[in-house]
C-alpha cells in the first residue's frame, strides 16, 4: 500500500482482507516492510509479537439429549438438548456471547415449536484462549417424532459476530 507521510512520526492503518473460513482456529501474525523509492527502510517481522497477532476463533460442538447423553432423543413434552461448545483462540479476559438455534436438518430452517424458534444464549468471560460452554435448549418435542435436528451457533464479541 502506498501512502504519503504528513509528519515525521505517525501511523498508517493497513487493512488485510481475507476469508476467515480457512483460518479458523489459527493465529495470524502481520509483518510489514517500509520502503521508499525501492529501498527498504524498516521491517517489522517478529513471529512472536503479540501486538501483531490476531486470533481467529474456532467453534466445535457436540449436542446430546440431557436425559440420556446420546444423540438420540425422545419426542416428549419436555426435551432438553445440551450443546457442548468448545471455543478456541479467543482472548482471555474479554466477554463473549454464544448464541445457538435448533435447526430442522431436513429443511435447513430454524425448528419451530408453536411458531417459535428454539434458541439459547450464554455470555461468558474468557479465562483463557480456549473455553468450553454449554447451551441448553428445552422445548416440547412431542410433535417432532422422526425429526432430525442440528444446533447452529454464533460467537459474538459485543455486537460483532466472530464465528459461525
Question: Model regions: which residues?
Answer:
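Contiguous beta-strand segments within globular domains
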Residues: 70-84
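Conserved small/polar residues in nucleotide/adenosyl-binding loops
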Residues: 161-163
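Short glycine/proline/serine/threonine-rich loop/turn segments at secondary-structure transition edges
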Residues: 20-30, 141-151
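Extracellular recognition modules
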Residues: 15, 29-35, 99-101, 150-154
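Solvent-exposed serine/threonine-rich low-complexity stretches and specific carbohydrate-binding patches
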Residues: 1-8, 112-129
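Aromatic sugar-binding surface patches on proteins
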Residues: 4-17, 127-138
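Short solvent-exposed strand-capping/beta-turn motif centered on an Asx-Ser/Thr pair
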Residues: 88-93, 105
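Short, solvent-exposed loop/edge segments of extracellular or virion-exposed proteins
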Residues: 60-71
Amino acid at each position: 500500500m502506498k501512502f504519503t507521510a504528513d509528519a515525521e512520526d505517525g501511523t498508517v492503518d493497513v487493512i488485510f482482507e481475507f476469508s476467515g473460513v480457512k483460518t479458523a482456529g489459527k493465529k495470524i501474525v502481520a509483518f510489514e516492510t517500509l520502503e521508499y523509492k525501492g529501498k527498504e527502510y524498516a521491517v517489522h517481522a517478529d513471529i512472536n509479537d503479540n501486538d501483531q497477532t490476531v486470533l481467529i476463533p474456532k467453534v466445535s460442538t457436540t449436542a446430546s439429549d440431557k436425559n440420556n447423553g446420546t444423540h438420540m432423543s425422545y419426542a416428549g413434552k419436555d426435551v432438553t438438548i445440551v450443546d457442548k461448545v468448545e471455543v478456541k483462540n479467543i482472548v482471555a479476559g474479554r466477554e463473549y456471547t454464544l448464541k445457538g438455534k435448533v435447526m430442522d436438518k431436513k429443511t435447513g430452517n430454524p425448528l419451530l415449536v408453536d411458531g417459535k424458534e428454539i434458541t439459547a444464549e450464554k455470555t461468558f468471560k474468557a479465562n483463557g484462549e480456549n473455553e468450553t460452554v454449554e447451551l441448553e435448549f428445552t422445548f416440547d418435542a412431542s410433535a417432532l417424532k422422526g425429526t432430525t435436528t442440528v444446533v447452529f451457533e454464533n460467537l459474538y464479541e459485543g455486537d460483532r459476530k466472530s464465528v459461525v
